[in-house]
Amino acid sequence: MNVIRARTAGFCMGVSLALRKLDREVDRAEEKAAQGSPRCRIATFGPIIHNPQVLEAYAGMGVRCLRQVDEVEAGDHVVIRAHGVPQQQEKALRSRDAVVVDATCPKVKKAQLGIEEQCRAGRTLLLFGEAEHPEVRGLLSYAGEGALVFGSVDELEGLPLQPETEYFLAAQTTQDRVAFEVARAWLHERLGHEVPVLETICDATRLRQQEAIDIARKVDAMVVVGGFDSGNTRRLADVAAAQGVFTVHVENESQLPVEQLRGCGIIGLTAGASTPKSIIDATQRFLESL
């Protein structure tokens, strides 16, 4: 089986940075314990990234995943997830007697602050994203009153837009660039003027999606590897499938539909921004063995 593997597959800068920060806290805790000091409790606030294998590995190291601020105990070292958290939660975390390490992706943090600046200038946010995604909940916390979220152009068309309101447009950092531009054009037509835009979709997302499209146009089937909870991985699968090629999204090689793939001559392989290289490698080896 011939496999074309995306060069952009695997950890992005934001994920790598978040994991390095968490690893540093784990290492420091182990060093203190080795010196005879009590081992401090390490936790993340929400899943550090959306990958089940990575989360399982950290759980095996004793890292807890907290969901509520009141779960934080005195002396805890708490690492904020790569997706960021609502600013009210961050303030509450920092009010606890704990060490708080912010592992929010720098691209997400930039989006948060950009949204806050626009809203302070009197504009109202139109956010292209998944309403229930943790990054989106965090972004909205910087937007104040009146912010509107839409997950598609169809949803945008159904929003109660007011002609007298000064809007600005932003997106979840891992959103589909093409769909974002369609939304931008629709707003221009609907409101009769260009809406100010925050360019919040990160370059890594754009490059991954474009490479997935390019590969999908050359192959008989496309395999996308990554957590089912990972929004950026789901969108890679979406943009690949939109090219008309059979596309499957799996979390590891054991989930591959072997019989459907066996007859393919060339298979494309890409992976989400939170997928470890070891899982991508294992998937590639399995595909090449078919």
Curated annotation (Swiss-Prot):
It catalyses: isopentenyl diphosphate + 2 oxidized [2Fe-2S]-[ferredoxin] + H2O = (2E)-4-hydroxy-3-methylbut-2-enyl diphosphate + 2 reduced [2Fe-2S]-[ferredoxin] + 2 H(+); dimethylallyl diphosphate + 2 oxidized [2Fe-2S]-[ferredoxin] + H2O = (2E)-4-hydroxy-3-methylbut-2-enyl diphosphate + 2 reduced [2Fe-2S]-[ferredoxin] + 2 H(+). (2E)-4-hydroxy-3-methylbut-2-enyl diphosphate binds at H50, H83, H133, T173, S230, N232, S274. Pathway: Isoprenoid biosynthesis; dimethylallyl diphosphate biosynthesis; dimethylallyl diphosphate from (2E)-4-hydroxy-3-methylbutenyl diphosphate: step 1/1; Isoprenoid biosynthesis; isopentenyl diphosphate biosynthesis via DXP pathway; isopentenyl diphosphate from 1-deoxy-D-xylulose 5-phosphate: step 6/6. Signal peptide: none annotated. Dimethylallyl diphosphate binds at H50, H83, H133, S230, N232, S274. Binds 1 [4Fe-4S] cluster per subunit. [4Fe-4S] cluster binds at C12, C105, C202. The active site is at E135 (proton donor). Keywords: 4Fe-4S, Iron, Iron-sulfur, Isoprene biosynthesis, Metal-binding, Oxidoreductase. Its EC number is 1.17.7.4. GO terms for molecular function: 4 iron, 4 sulfur cluster binding; 4-hydroxy-3-methylbut-2-enyl diphosphate reductase activity; metal ion binding. One of its GO terms (biological process) is isopentenyl diphosphate biosynthetic process, methylerythritol 4-phosphate pathway. Isopentenyl diphosphate binds at H50, H83, H133, S230, N232, S274. Its cofactor is [4Fe-4S] cluster. Gene3D superfamilies: 3.40.50.11270, 4-hydroxy-3-methylbut-2-enyl diphosphate reductase, catalytic domain (3.40.1010.20). Catalyzes the conversion of 1-hydroxy-2-methyl-2-(E)-butenyl 4-diphosphate (HMBPP) into a mixture of isopentenyl diphosphate (IPP) and dimethylallyl diphosphate (DMAPP). Acts in the terminal step of the DOXP/MEP pathway for isoprenoid precursor biosynthesis. Belongs to the IspH family. This is 4-hydroxy-3-methylbut-2-enyl diphosphate reductase. It comes from Nitratidesulfovibrio vulgaris (strain ATCC 29579 / DSM 644 / CCUG 34227 / NCIMB 8303 / VKM B-1760 / Hildenborough). The lineage of its organism: Bacteria, Pseudomonadati, Thermodesulfobacteriota, Desulfovibrionia, Desulfovibrionales.
